[in-house]
Amino acid sequence: MKIGLCAYSGYKIYPGHGKTMVKVDGKNFTFLNSKCEAAHLMRRNPRKVTWTVLYRRKFKKGQEEEQAKKRTRRTQKYQRAIVGASLSDIMAKRNMKPEVRKAQREQAIKQAKEQKKSTKASKKTTAPPTKGKAAPKAKAAKVSQKAAPRVGGKR
């Protein structure tokens, strides 16, 4: 027993029912009843007609019991070592008291400043003395074009 589908509504057509329309270009349309055929001939969009299968699919009608809601995977946190720091070092820094951390930071900043100062001083001593300021180059004056005269009076 062959069960067909309606070209307009999408409902099943059982043997002995329905009507087949063949167009001049050779396209076959099988309709469940005259209601479907008339709607097709009036060029009604089956996605906008509420009782068709296409409409029900478009607006997700009657699918709640069939499909369970998809479960999303929760992200999990892992603690692992980074290149240049072992996990124990990271945990020790994390568990450090804020006062100790602040003192360490200030000490590191002080050290960096001293190092910068020493490198700057060494550069100063090795740099050759300059013979005074070089004369600045004279810039060429820009030639500005005069605006074209306005024509046509007030706008």
From Swiss-Prot:
The record's section on SUPFAM superfamilies has: Glucocorticoid receptor-like (DNA-binding domain)
- Whether Nucleus counts among this entry's keywords is no
Composition-biased stretches (Basic and acidic residues): 96-117
Domain of life according to the entry = Eukaryota
List GO molecular-function terms, semicolon-separated: mRNA binding; structural constituent of ribosome
Output the GO biological process annotations, alphabetical, semicolon-separated. Answer: cytoplasmic translation
Gene3D superfamilies linked: 6.10.250.1270, Ribosomal protein L24e (2.30.170.20)
Write out the biased-composition intervals (Low complexity): 124-133
* Entry keyword set: Ribonucleoprotein, Ribosomal protein
Keyword check for Ribosomal protein: yes
**What are the GO cellular component annotations?**
cytosolic large ribosomal subunit
A Pfam family it matches: Ribosomal_L24e
| Region (Disordered), start-end ranges | 92-155
Q: Which family does it belong to?
A: Belongs to the eukaryotic ribosomal protein eL24 family.
What is the protein named?
A: Large ribosomal subunit protein eL24
Question: Source species, please?
Answer: Plutella xylostella (Diamondback moth)
